[in-house]
Regions:
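RNase H-like, Mg2+-dependent phosphodiesterase core
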Residues: 1-146
Length: 146
């Protein structure tokens, strides 16, 4: 009998406003559950009678899910230890960087240089915030000390 392994990834994000209002920990927990639910839906479309008890869910760092599905494993520094977590991490980063490049074309954000630093806390990004203030893409809870 031939078995086939599959790798599924889902990337979702929360707005800066959501993160500031609910807190980063709550938003991350919500996103972990949301992503797992989206992956389960993808699997059910491909295999309508899939049994999820054989599903292996790898979570990086201290991530946890409230969902009682599959065989879940949390791995500290998982992106250094598990190839699949590394791949998912790169996929998420590229997705975020692509989004930042896209919004950098909007005149509303042109002063921030998102196309260069993609929102990471570089010196040029911090200087742009000091010159122009925070935009709705900035987490005030994170940028408070600028």
């Amino acid at each position: 009998e031939k078995t086939e392994d599959s790798f599924y990834v889902s990337v979702q994000s929360k707005s800066a406003t959501d993160i500031d209002q609910k807190g980063i920990a709550v938003c991350i927990a919500d996103l972990v559950d949301l992503n797992i639910k989206k992956i389960l839906k993808k699997i059910q479309k491909i295999e309508p009678y899939a049994e999820f008890q054989n599903l292996h869910i790898l979570l990086d760092g201290a991530l946890k899910t409230s969902l009682k599905v599959g065989n879940q494993k949390t791995i500290i520094k998982g992106d250094e230890k598990e190839l699949l977590i590394s791949l998912a991490s790169v996929y998420a980063k590229v997705t975020r960087d692509t989004y930042m490049k896209k919004i950098s074309k909007n005149p509303k954000y042109s002063q921030y240089g998102f196309e260069v630093h993609k929102g990471y806390g570089t010196l040029n990004h911090r200087r742009a915030i000091q010159r122009g203030g925070l935009s709705d893409e900035h987490r005030r809870s994170f940028c408070g000390r600028l």
